[in-house]
Structure formats: structure tokens, C-alpha cells
Amino acid sequence: MARRFDGKNVIVTGAGRGIGRAIAQRFASEGADVMCVGRTLEPLEKTVALCGSGFAHSADVSVSADAGGMVDAALDRWERIDVLVNNAGIDDETPFLDMDEGNWDAVIATNLRGPFVVSQRVGRVMAEQGGGVILHNASIDASGGDGPFASYNASKAGILGLNRTMAVELAPHGIRVNAVSPGFTHTDMTERAVGPKLMEYLLHDFDRVPMRRLVKPEEIAAAFVFLASDDASGITGINLTVDCGLTANWYILETLPTE
């Protein structure tokens, strides 16, 4: 039986770990040939091995020359680019009053400038070939005040604005553009950040979240694959939240004194 992405070519940035790796694996399992992009080749090559196909390419998405080289490498292998997933991202925990411009610029360069640069180059290819799909990894932090992540939150809010504008401008070219906003997700970065005791709580009794657990990377990947598929052919310009219900819960009564 044919798979949804048989014969399709997909670029995933930030594919060396976590959500990006899960996205690459899911597309590969659905038949796609996946270009795994990131700054360091070793983890990308591990992702390719887990996918069982595809190839790795080292690039810094915030650097225009690297973005151009990435597109050139893709077109050396493929005749067309069907899907781009802008997943690469970094954060910075410097408190707002202590943050310098270097902290700010580094996060904005990767998280917002990078998707603009890469999307523009890939978008031109897609417009010429008659269509395609561009997807952005945003965050629930785009709509909240999670701290101390001022630069990260601002970059993800910018992604949602870029997402809507791209959807409107690129629709006449047959290009759909959507975003996915993950909630707290179980990745190796999360485990390192919180430690084993807190991780056990987050995985099984996270009472701030209605489903009482973290999101799985595979659940995020499923959202990306759906939005890239023909099953979502009428969907563009949306932001799909995958957070186990976190942003639906105002959590007001639970914080009040019991007496």
C-alpha cells in the first residue's frame, strides 16, 4: 500500500535531536526522502540511520550563505522540494534585566531570521515548481509570558506573525504555510534541565496539564506530518497547538487557598 509521502522530498532543520529527530523519522516512515539539517553532522547522521534513508547536511540556518548552500545541496539530489520544516531553534535563560544584545541577537538570529532566510529560498523554488508546504515549529510560549525566556518568547511570537503573512502571500503560488506550537515536551534537553525526580512528576502527575503528562516528540511529529499531507490540503495559516491541554487550563481555582 502506498504511503502518504512516497516520492516526496522533505527538509527538516534542527533534525539532530528531540522534536526535529522525531519529525524526520516520522516523515521517513511515511515514505519521504529526508534531508536532515543542523550545525553538527554527527547527530544528524544518527538521525539518518534511525530513518533508514535520507541524508545529512551541515548548515547554520541563520547564515544566508549556509541557507543557500542547503537549497543547492537539496536540488543536487532532488528535482523538487515538497516540504520544508523550520524546526531549528535555541533558547537563552538570561533574565530580562541582565540580558545583553548578544544574548538577544543570537536567539532571534536562529529562531526568527533563520526561518525567514530558509523559507524565502525554499519558497522561491516551490513557487517555480508550482507548490509545496512550509511548516514552522513555534511554541506555546509565543502566547505566554514564560520566563526568563524573553528572547525565545519574542522569537516564537514573531514566527506566528511570519506564518500568517507567508500563508497569505504564498497561497497564490500553491504553497501552504502552517505552524505547530508544542507544549512542554519530553526530550533529552528536558531531562537534563529538570533532573530525574522532577521528570518523574512531569511524566506522570503534571497537574498543571489536564492530561497530566508531557507531550511526546512523536505526537508533535504527527502534527507536522498531518499538516504537510494532502489530508490538510485546505489548511493554511493556522497554528496547531499540541500541549496535552495546558493552554486550555486557566488553573485559577487550583491556586486558591482551600480555606
Tell where the protein language model's regions lie, with residue ranges.
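Substrate-binding pocket helix/loop in short-chain dehydrogenase/reductase
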Residues: 95-96, 103-108, 205
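Active-site helix of classical SDR
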Residues: 119, 155, 163
